[in-house]
Amino acid sequence: MSKIIDITGREILDSRGNPTVEADVVLEGGVRGRAAVPSGASTGTREAVELRDEDSSRYGGQGVLKAVGHINGDIRQRLVGQEAEAQESIDQAMLDLDGTSSKRRLGANAILAVSLAVARAAALAAEKPLYRYLSADERFQMPVPMMNIINGGAHADNNVDLQEFMIVPVGAGSIAEAVRYGAEVFHALKKVLRGRGLGTGVGDEGGFAPDLSSNVAAIEAILEAITQAGFEPGRDISLALDTASSEFYQDGRYVLASEGKTLDKEEFTGVLASWVEQYPILSVEDGMAEDDWEGWALLTQRLGQRVQLVGDDLFVTNTAILKEGINRGIANSILIKVNQIGTLTETLAAIRMAHEAGYTAVISHRSGETEDTTIADLAVATQSGQIKTGSLSRTDRVAKYNQLLRIEAELGDKAHYPGRQAFTHP
C-alpha cells in the first residue's frame, strides 16, 4: 500500500484555450500521478457542476482558481495520509467533503482531477500501466472508435444542425488498422470537400466544419470519401451520428434550422428512421432531447432493435438516471464521460450497471480536451468495446489514438478488436 503524501492542483488550458484543472498526487517513494479534466460544449442539464470562478477580469469568467484552491486546501488536507489503492474510499471522502448531490461546492472538475490522479499514482506504484491496474481480470478488448470527421452543432461555427458525423471502422482487424482506415478517410474527405469548393477548417473535435446544404449532405460527402479511400461503406466502415438533439429542441419541437424544418417527435423519429434505412448507420446518440422521454420511448420502439441508441445528455453517466432509463426501456446504450459524474468510482459503477442490463457503454472524450489519455486506458480496462475521441486531427484527439496503439502493441495477441460485434445490433 502507498500513502498519499502530497496533492497539488493547478490551472491549465484545454484544447479550446479555456482554463481547466490538473492535479498531481504524490505517494511515498516519490511516485507522482497526474490527471487533467476535460470540459464540454453541449452539456446535459443534470451533469455534475464544473466550478468556474465567474471573475470577468480573468479568462472571461472561465477561470478555475476556486476549484484549484479546493484541491490545494480541503481536499489535500482530507486525503494526505490515505492509501492510494483505496480508490472507492478516497472518492467517497471527497463526496462527503463536498456534501452536495451535484458536487457544486468543491466542483466536479476539482474532485475528478484528484480522483483520476490517485488512480494513476496507484498504478505507477504497482508498476502497472493504468489499463491493467483498472482491469478486473486479464481479458483486454480494444475499443472500436467512432471518429467524428464532420463537426456541426455546438462543436463548430457552421450551419450544420447535427453535432457529429462519425465513421466506424467495423471491418478493421485491429486498432492499428482502424486508425489507418480513419486517417485515410479523413484525408479523402478533405479532398472531397475541397473539390466541392467547401471549407476544410476543423471544429473542436478535429473534424471538418464546412457549411453544407443539409445534414444529409454531410453523410453523403463522408460516403464518397469512404469509397474514394478504397473502402466499402457498411462492410469496412459504417456510420454513427450524434444528433445532440437537446441543442435544437425548442418548445417541444425539433428545429432543423439549416433545412428550414420544425418537426414534432414523431416526425423527427421518422427522419432518423429514414436515414437508418437509407445509409449504413449503426449508432445514433442523443436522438431525442434529454427531457423528451416520450420521444425517447418512441425512438427506442422504432429503432431500438435495429441500431445502437446512445444516451449522453439523457443519462449523463449517472447511475440513478440510467437505472430509470433501463426500467423504462429507454435507449440501449450509455455514453460514458468521466466529468459528467466526477469520480472514477462512479464512472466504473455506471459502466457496470450498463453492462449488467445488456446496454453497451461508449467511453467518450469532451469537446474541450487535454493531452490526458485516461479514457483510452479506461476503454480497454472495462472492455467497453467502443470509444469516441474525435477525428484524426488535433493532438488532443490523436493523443488518445496513439495511446490505444501503444496498448495494443504491448498486449500483442491478447488484444482483441471486436469490430461490428461491439455494437448492440451489428
Curated annotation (Swiss-Prot):
A GO molecular function held by the record: phosphopyruvate hydratase activity
State where the protein is found.
Answer: Cytoplasm; Secreted; Cell surface
Which SUPFAM superfamilies does this UniProt record tie to the protein? Enolase C-terminal domain-like, Enolase N-terminal domain-like
Q: Which residues are noted in the entry as (2R)-2-phosphoglycerate-binding?
A: Q163, K337, R366, S367, K388
Q: Which UniProt keywords apply?
A: Cytoplasm, Glycolysis, Lyase, Magnesium, Metal-binding, Secreted
Coiled-coil segments? none
For biological process, the GO terms are: glycolytic process
Which Gene Ontology CC terms are recorded? cell surface; extracellular region; phosphopyruvate hydratase complex
Q: What InterPro entries does this protein's entry cite?
A: Enolase, Enolase-like_C_sf, Enolase-like_N, Enolase_C, Enolase_CS, Enolase_N
Pathway where it operates: Carbohydrate degradation; glycolysis; pyruvate from D-glyceraldehyde 3-phosphate: step 4/5
Record's keyword annotation contains Cytoplasm: yes
| Catalytic function, reaction form | (2R)-2-phosphoglycerate = phosphoenolpyruvate + H2O
User: Manganese: is it a keyword of this entry?
Assistant: no
Cofactor remark: Binds a second Mg(2+) ion via substrate during catalysis.
Question: What is the purpose of this protein?
Answer: Catalyzes the reversible conversion of 2-phosphoglycerate (2-PG) into phosphoenolpyruvate (PEP). It is essential for the degradation of carbohydrates via glycolysis.
Subunit annotation: Component of the RNA degradosome, a multiprotein complex involved in RNA processing and mRNA degradation.
Q: What name has this protein been given in UniProt? A: Enolase
Its source organism is: Nitrosococcus oceani (strain ATCC 19707 / BCRC 17464 / JCM 30415 / NCIMB 11848 / C-107)
Its taxonomic placement starts with: Bacteria, Pseudomonadati, Pseudomonadota, Gammaproteobacteria, Chromatiales
